[in-house]
């Protein structure tokens, strides 16, 4: 079971890896790519902690979760229905973001809720196992959104 969880987490992290395609992005496309890249980098570090490759640092996870919450608040505004946002330089956003706006916003809401659960787990100083489970839920919410709304 643990192997499956780590495999799922590895797939998630791979899908979030910043590609060379980000070079040359401008404007709102670059802003959202930068935010996603930062979340990806932090998620990779947290994943290494849960794999035992790095010491578990709850302060780092807390700071990351707070940053995720700030990024999530602006995600709603970083995908306006404009030509630049839809077709801008190097965008990886699929048209389904605008065609299924309610579904896209539901995905962001799920991420916000999962991240809130992670923050609660940190606040109540739950076991490492429970904290890992909360983080995996956050990671899965990212993967789910990328599956439906991001070019691979």
Predicted feature descriptions by range:
Residues 26-152:
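Sequence context surrounding c-type heme c attachment/ligation sites in exported
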Residues 1-5:
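Positively charged n-region of N-terminal signal peptides that target proteins for export
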């Amino acid at each position: 079971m643990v192997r499956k969880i780590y495999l799922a987490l590895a797939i998630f992290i791979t899908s979030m890896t910043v590609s060379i395609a980000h070079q040359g992005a401008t404007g709102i496309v670059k802003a959202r790519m930068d935010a996603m890249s930062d979340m990806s980098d932090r998620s990779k570090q947290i994943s290494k902690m849960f794999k035992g490759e790095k010491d578990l640092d709850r302060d780092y996870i807390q700071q990351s979760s707070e940053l995720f919450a700030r990024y999530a608040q602006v995600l709603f505004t970083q995908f306006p229905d404009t030509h630049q946002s839809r077709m801008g330089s190097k965008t990886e956003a699929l048209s389904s973001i605008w065609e299924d706006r309610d579904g896209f916003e539901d995905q962001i809401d799920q991420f916000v809720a999962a991240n809130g659960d992670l923050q609660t787990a940190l606040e109540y100083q739950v076991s490492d196992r429970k904290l890992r489970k909360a983080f995996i839920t956050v990671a899965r919410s990212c993967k789910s959104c990328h599956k439906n709304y991001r070019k691979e």
